[in-house]
């Protein structure tokens, strides 16, 4: 065990320290000299001036002794065994020199060293106890099983401190009001994101009376040219409260309701150096003279994570590096848990879980670097007495796996009962089990600090766990953004799980992408369903009336390239008729509408039966065509087949490339007469392509439309042209990102659904022109969709 003294360049203090050390240990030697930084000296001078002013005014009573610290010696733990005494003194104890360090570094690889640190005076020991931060741990009691004294006062938040402030400055400023358990500058916001020093600090007095006096006297005082504020800290500071629970160089692990850590950890030691960035002057690790060292731990800790392993004993997947500890003493804190388990290896994190009121939930988690360390701790500590209780230690089973195991047991019991009382088909039972299982599925996917799904964390999981998490997340989100029924939910989720991980993450982070992926999944399922339908031989039908193609011209991009197939069978037509009746008002020409929908390609017919939104869209289009027929006096509907025969299909299709045709060059067979007067509302009821055609016609002067800016028109056309050759989904995705933002500015609910409906029912180029050049018409069209309930 090494024994070294470190002191500043101060001759009389150094001689006094040497004399004291000689009396205690003749073998003590002086190995290094460390000076306080200039900024620290300036801050300390400002604190002394403030304290002197209050003392002269009679505001501050003489300093009282620490209620628990009786000698200038503290027990030290959490020291990197590769760190020298000189580095430890310069980085951690530079504000309280001289110190005598006795560190036992004869520990296993990856384990931390411990020992004692002795100070010249009791005041310096008290200051170090209140200001030293993790991973270094200071204790008054040598026995780690004895709980450290806990302050009874509520924490105080200090704001508007000078930018040169550090922990030592804050301590010196407030110590005259009473003994402090903690005096540290805040380097993170309440959400746990590292922000650096922003002029705030947190104080913990042992006595509430001392805290109230400090708040009363120091609030609005001038410190370093700034007026500070002092008040009770009411914020829940995840990182600050848990700072002592995490090693700064380790990745955070918080197995709570969500698998994402509540506070990302950061490494205050950049590669090759033990000091933090010079911009973080508030950190106690900031020093101008720290020598760089080689940190052998970082490389191992930042490597690949250990995947979940299957435990035959538990019949589930477990995390081999993480321990679940229950039946904890209610008074046990995270520091106590860390100190208890640190002898078994390198601890990544140790946390006692608490409720919203800060009360212990009597269980916690300890995460080790390797499975061997965790296994050793499990064998040694299971059923061991810790505090007043015997603890139970188990390998951590992720919440997802635990709930799925319970669901499997529950469903197995239900299956046994149903076998005796029901003769339902096995496939239906399996689907029911699958849905029931999801009722237990509450775990969330890993997310980053901004709340977005973290692709890298998902990628680090095993395929089984990753798919389970994605399945649960899709199951929760799909009903919120789409009209997928309970019967369809499992199949749609199954299709989404077949996506690439990057595409799945994009869908979860982007509601527009999610709705589009759901639409694609339903279409793919409809194709599979349609392949099982039996269709009669197709019969030709000449397209004498181009207006008949109107129902095809409004088709989704994804279905625009379908080829003509056989018409609907009698049984299928009956299903279509029932579906049409369910979405039309009383008195509507349901037979004619059904005939027109029955003439669609097999793929679209199946989609109409499967997707209520798609069916309603096609019904509306069919009604528009029938209305035009009534006005012209011509019968443009396909001939209805006699009973027992199938309707005759259309043989002419709209090519997919037509969506990129400039709407200004196209001619609409359903356009109203040129002499007709338009209002904004009647214009919005027209297809986007027709609106753009009218806006570009010679008679556009009478329309309630502004003149389009040529530069905007060209930019829009260039954007649409850039999408040519891309997949239909990508085309909609690119335009949808812009359209969604525009619709959201209208202040309507259900913007994602409205966006998808417009993308599926309108010509993309024309829709882009409405968005960029005719915003008023687009807004009116959106209001029409809202009135029709298409945003629900």
From Swiss-Prot:
PROSITE patterns: RRM (PS50102)
Outcome reported for the amino acid change (mutating residue 753 to A): Leads to a reduction of RNA-binding
UniProt record, GO biological process: mRNA transport
GO cellular component, one term: nucleus
InterPro entries in the cross-refs: Nucleotide-bd_a/b_plait_sf, PABP-dom, PABP_HYD_C, RBD_domain_sf, RRM_dom
Gene this chain is encoded by: RRM4
Domain PABC: 715-792
Quaternary state and interactors: Part of large ribonucleoprotein complexes (mRNPs) containing RNA-binding proteins RRM4 and PAB1, endosome-binding protein UPA1, core scaffold protein UPA2 and associated factor GRP1. Interacts (via PABC domain) with UPA1 (via PAM2 domain).
Segments forming a coiled coil: none
Listed name of the protein: RNA-binding protein RRM4
Cellular localization per UniProt: Cytoplasm, Cytoskeleton; Endosome
Keywords: Cytoplasm, Cytoskeleton, Endosome, mRNA transport, Repeat, RNA-binding, Transport
Organism this protein belongs to: Mycosarcoma maydis (Corn smut fungus)
Function comment: Key RNA-binding protein involved in the formation of polar-growing hyphae which is essential for infection by the plant pathogen. During filamentation, assembles into particles that shuttle bidirectionally along microtubules to both poles. The RRM4 transport particles are part of the endosomal mRNP transport that regulates polarity of the infectious hyphae by transporting distinct mRNAs encoding, for example, the ubiquitin fusion protein UBI1, the small G protein RHO3, or the septin CDC3, from the nucleus to cell poles.
Main location: cytoplasm
GO molecular function, one term: poly(A) binding
Domain RRM: 72-145, 154-235, 321-398
